[in-house]
Structures are given as C-alpha cells and as structure tokens.
C-alpha cells in the first residue's frame, strides 16, 4: 500500500475525499472528465469534493460543463474552489454564476452514513409567541445524550398555503441556525404559512419535521 495506491487506502477509511482535478475537460494528459469518473469509481462510496482551478475553468469557458458532469456523479457532493479569491473577485462572472444558478439556496452538508446515520429526535414545543421584539417561533432542543444524537443546529423551512411540505426543496430553507428561535416576518396577520423545523446532529443527519401553521 503506497500513497499512490488510492483504491487500497480508501477502503475502510472513515473519511471524505477532496481530490485536485485542476485541469480542463479535454486535456490530453489529464482530462477532467476521465479523472472525475476515475475518482467516482474508486472512491468506495465516500463523498467526493472536487478541487477545481477557477482560472482554468474560466479560461476555457467550462463552468457549465464541469457542473453538469459533477451532477451526473452520485457521490460528488461539492467543490473546493482554488483559489477562492478568484470567485470573490468574480473573474469571468464565476462568482455571479455560482450565486445565481448553482448555489442560490442554503445547503446542508453531505451526509456520511459510514460514520453515523441515526437522526436526532425532533425539536420539541414548537410554538409562535408574541414578544416585545415581534412574533417569534420558539422550540426546545430534543433530548440526546451522546455526540451522535445531540442536536447541534436546526433548519427552518417555510411553505405557503396549499404548498406541499417537501423538506428536500432547498428553496424553502429560511435558516440553518444554532438558536432555538426564529423571528417571523409578520405583515398583517391575513396570510397562512406553514413553518417546519427540523434538528440536525453534528453530521447533519436530519430529524423528522415538526410543523406549525401561523398567520402572518
């Protein structure tokens, strides 16, 4: 077993993998497409976070192609941007495209069931309360004793009247918070909304949802 024997040292490891695939699609010596498929094949089911050279991606106009290719791979769970300042500086509209098209909504971290897959219990006593600071949705942390069943943060979703409750839709996430309250955007008390709160453990296993309908 050597540092280059990827298929050997990954097996049995409790880890995720961040591989540096800095080249572009079509590079003769190191094709991004070929390398991505290779890593997917030998990742042993571990989540992959692809290291991407933003300058190269922008230079060859391959942002959309690389995103589409990554989305085809079931265990590619994210991207490591190198270097991040290029995205912040919005070189080639890279950062704008991320915010507008790919990363528009909040996201939960990828799950790692090979470490722990048991979800925490649901939040308790979810209740909207009028306070001097406005209309607040409060809840109580679920009971948990060990690191793998204690809630570390919560997800707050909002659905309009008549909408199907679907916590797999990230556009409905209003907040991921470590607080046990959320300030509601009260308007005139005429419109019904259903707020959903779930608990996350430190590996982001998500509890069953708790619903509360309020008029805002």
Residue ranges and their predicted role:
Residues 22-27, 54-57, 84-88:
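Solvent-exposed loop/turn segments at secondary-structure junctions
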Residues 177-183:
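Short S/T/G- and acidic-enriched coil/turn segments that sit immediately N-terminal to beta-strands
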Residues 142-168:
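Solvent-exposed loop/turn segments flanking beta-strands in beta-repeat/beta-sandwich domains
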Residues 2-12, 16:
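Single conserved hydrophobic/aromatic residue that forms the stacking wall/gate
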Residues 1, 21, 35-66:
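Active-site clefts of carbohydrate-active enzymes
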Residues 184-206:
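Beta-strand-rich modules
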Residues 17-19, 48-52, 78-82:
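Hydrophobic faces of well-ordered beta-strands that scaffold small-molecule active sites
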Residues 98-148, 204-216:
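Pro/Thr/Ser/Gly-rich low-complexity, intrinsically disordered linker/stalk tracts
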């Amino acid at each position: 077993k050597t540092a280059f024997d990827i298929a050997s040292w990954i097996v049995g490891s409790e880890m995720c993998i961040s591989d540096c695939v800095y080249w572009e699609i079509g590079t003769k010596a190191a094709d991004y497409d070929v390398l991505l498929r290779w890593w997917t094949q030998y990742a042993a089911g571990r989540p992959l976070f692809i290291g991407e050279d933003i300058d190269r991606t922008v230079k060859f106009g391959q942002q959309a192609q690389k995103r589409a290719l990554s989305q085809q791979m079931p265990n590619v769970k994210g991207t490591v941007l190198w270097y991040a300042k290029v995205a912040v500086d919005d070189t080639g509209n890279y950062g704008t495209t991320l915010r507008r098209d790919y990363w528009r909504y909040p996201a939960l971290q990828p799950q790692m069931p090979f470490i722990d897959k048991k979800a925490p219990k649901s939040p308790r006593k979810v209740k909207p309360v009028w306070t001097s600071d406005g209309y607040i949705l409060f809840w109580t942390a679920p009971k948990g004793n060990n690191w793998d069943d204690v809630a570390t943060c919560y997800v707050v979703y909002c659905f309009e009247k008549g909408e199907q409750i679907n916590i797999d839709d990230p556009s409905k996430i209003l907040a991921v918070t470590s607080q046990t309250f959320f300030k509601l955007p009260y308007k005139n008390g005429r419109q019904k909304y259903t707020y959903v709160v779930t608990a996350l453990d430190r590996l982001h296993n998500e509890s069953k949802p708790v619903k509360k309908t309020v008029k805002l």
